[in-house]
Amino acid sequence: VGFKAGVKEYKLTYYTPTYETKDTDILAAFRVTPQPGVPPEEAGAAVAAESSTGTWTTVWTDGLTSLDRYKGRCYHIEPVAGEESQFIAYVAYPLDLFEEGSVTNMFTSIVGNVFGFKALRALRLEDLRIPVAYVKTFQGPPHGIQVERDKLNKYGRPLLGCTIKPKLGLSAKNYGRAVYECLRGGLDFTKDDENVNSQPFMRWRDRFLFCAEANYKSQAETGEIKGHYLNATAGTCEEMMKRAVFARELGVPIVMHDYLTGGFTANTSLAHYCRDNGLLLHIHRAMHAVIDRQKNHGIHFRVLAKALRMSGGDHIHSGTVVGKLEGERDITLGFVDLLRDDFVEKDRSRGIYFTQDWVSLPGVLPVASGGIHVWHMPALTEIFGDDSVLQFGGGTLGHPWGKPPGAVANRVALEACVQARNEGRDLAREGNEIIREASKWSPELAAACEVWKEIKFEFEAMDTL
């Protein structure tokens, strides 16, 4: 048979530097840190093997299949600048290894086992190229950016949101009141916090009812379409769907899900329901930093963002850039483009390892939230552009005069920035001046400017190239 038992080096089978990648291959870029003494080719080949057809020894059933057709291949290795013992291993996977329309299966294959592998000290999945043939097996976001704008009748500016705080402990009625005040003041959206599900102090059904009431009341008074992200995340998929169905029955425009803690299977089911029933879907990335914070181990957020676009969501939290370092800005804008655009060119300076063609998959709105306030508005408008959601939690609710004036301050600041931009002014250079001018006409904005003039969150960026 030519079958020879025993252990053989991975690189004999799985390191193929002459391989020409196919248009249908899923391509992965791994940052590999091998154990001392393990050569790069062997480590790269081990990653390819253990995440596809390989196992630690030769098995006779290998003879019953065509390894050449099904094996992952490490086809290129390059050193990481400034790192002694790290390199980028590029691996190509044949499309047949993956179930159609299943992000769950894709991740189980590519990152399921190999991250615990002893020959490696650390491993990080930096990027994935999803071939068009695989993209087409996914529904993707329930609606996408254009449909959302049409549903909301809001054009030519970023959308404004606010997370209701304190996130835990309010009764449903007080919570609904906070929602109403923010929406009434001029915000487009308010948001359940990611850990607001159905706790003893506020059961989900009560919250949904009071928030729907707040939604309708604020719409009637302002003449604008409003939304509150009702968090449907639950302990079981059935319970999650029950909440989504109830939201639809209330006639609200949008629900929400924590896609990493809830899981991709649950998320994809919910996304399908949302498209079929006209609900927008807001996605929170709770737990992402557990996976993406370490520079040498885990999965970079741009991969989790791509996976979400495949699984389905209309909004996703994507960091703020503001008040942090410049290096982070390019990387963040890299995955923001991957969320929004149809076609994204390879650009290593922005952390994009592969050209990605999304064909006709709808786009996702990036959500900037976390530690931002009115002084950040010019920078946020300039960095994220119109197709984004800017979310101010404390930056709305912390206003010295209360929530409605806090909402007014944010809306005035945003409208001023958009108008200044449309008049050709430079938001990056004149931002503070633009806000100051606007605050002369808005006492609410002036009060907000006074409160937050000194607040900064200055730390070194973790996410550098």
Swiss-Prot record:
Where is the PTM N6,N6,N6-trimethyllysine found along the chain?
Answer: K4
Name the InterPro entries on file: RuBisCO (IPR033966), RuBisCo_large_chain_AS (IPR020878), RuBisCO_lsu_C (IPR000685), RuBisCO_lsu_C_sf (IPR036376), RuBisCO_lsu_fd_N (IPR017443), RuBisCO_lsu_N_sf (IPR036422), RuBisCO_lsuI (IPR020888)
Task: Write out the catalysed reaction.
Answer: 2 (2R)-3-phosphoglycerate + 2 H(+) = D-ribulose 1,5-bisphosphate + CO2 + H2O; D-ribulose 1,5-bisphosphate + O2 = 2-phosphoglycolate + (2R)-3-phosphoglycerate + 2 H(+)
Chief site of localization: plastid
Q: What is its EC number?
A: 4.1.1.39
Gene3D superfamilies noted in UniProt: Ribulose bisphosphate carboxylase, large subunit, C-terminal domain, RuBisCO large subunit, N-terminal domain
What are the positions of the active site? Answer: K165 (proton acceptor), H284 (proton acceptor)
Q: How is the cofactor bound?
A: Binds 1 Mg(2+) ion per subunit.
Residues binding Mg(2+): K191, D193, E194
Compartments, record wording: Plastid, Chloroplast
Task: Spell out the post-translational modification annotation for this entry.
Answer: The disulfide bond which can form in the large chain dimeric partners within the hexadecamer appears to be associated with oxidative stress and protein turnover.
Q: For substrate, which residues are the binding ones?
A: N113, T163, K167, R285, H317, S369
Keywords on this record? Calvin cycle, Carbon dioxide fixation, Chloroplast, Disulfide bond, Lyase, Magnesium, Metal-binding, Methylation, Monooxygenase, Oxidoreductase, Photorespiration, Photosynthesis, Plastid
Which CDD domains does its entry note?
RuBisCO_large_I
List modified residues, type N6-carboxylysine. Answer: K191
Q: Which cofactor does it need?
A: Mg(2+)
Oligomeric form and interacting partners = Heterohexadecamer of 8 large chains and 8 small chains; disulfide-linked. The disulfide link is formed within the large subunit homodimers.
Q: What is this protein called?
A: Ribulose bisphosphate carboxylase large chain
* Source organism per UniProt: Cornus canadensis
